């Protein structure tokens, strides 16, 4: 059986926060909240630094500056109706799980934002990982109604993890 989350650590500082455990916990909670079987899916989380995420942000979003988290869904899953939850993907089987996509998260930006917001960095990272996984599942915040849905979904998932409402 493949693990739900494959973690790639490009910046060793992520090991201090135990990114693999944070990523697995966030992904499992997100899928469970949406009634999706964790054993039917897989995703990749890369822990990197600001320089690497700025490079990726420039290449994929034409914004050559650091950001906190980026995600690349394996396929388009967004809902056609603003404010409506996207249709969940069909799970694979445990031996051949359905790939959801990739998430990258930047160490310095996460540390800085957590300090600015006066919250534990692990809570902030957990929030951003839930946010990234929701993007892989088709959630977005382009339209106001979609943003409201995504924030409410994040808040519900985070509450189940004991993380206070980030909004």
Swiss-Prot record:
Keywords in alphabetical order: Cytoplasm, Endonuclease, Hydrolase, Metal-binding, Nuclease, Ribosome biogenesis, rRNA processing, Zinc
InterPro entries found in the cross-reference section: MetalPrtase_cat_dom_sf_prd, YbeY, YbeY_CS
EC number: 3.1.-.-
Residue span of region Disordered: 64-101
Record's GO cellular component terms: cytoplasm
PROSITE patterns associated with the record: UPF0054
A Gene Ontology biological process term: rRNA processing
Disulphide bonds in the chain: none
Subcellular location: Cytoplasm
Annotated Zn(2+) binding sites: 131, 135, 141
Gene Ontology molecular function: metalloendopeptidase activity; RNA endonuclease activity; zinc ion binding
Organism domain of life: Bacteria
Task of the protein: Single strand-specific metallo-endoribonuclease involved in late-stage 70S ribosome quality control and in maturation of the 3' terminus of the 16S rRNA.
PANTHER family: ENDORIBONUCLEASE YBEY, CHLOROPLASTIC
Family: Belongs to the endoribonuclease YbeY family.
Protein name as it appears in the record: Endoribonuclease YbeY
Species: Cereibacter sphaeroides (strain ATCC 17023 / DSM 158 / JCM 6121 / CCUG 31486 / LMG 2827 / NBRC 12203 / NCIMB 8253 / ATH 2.4.1.)
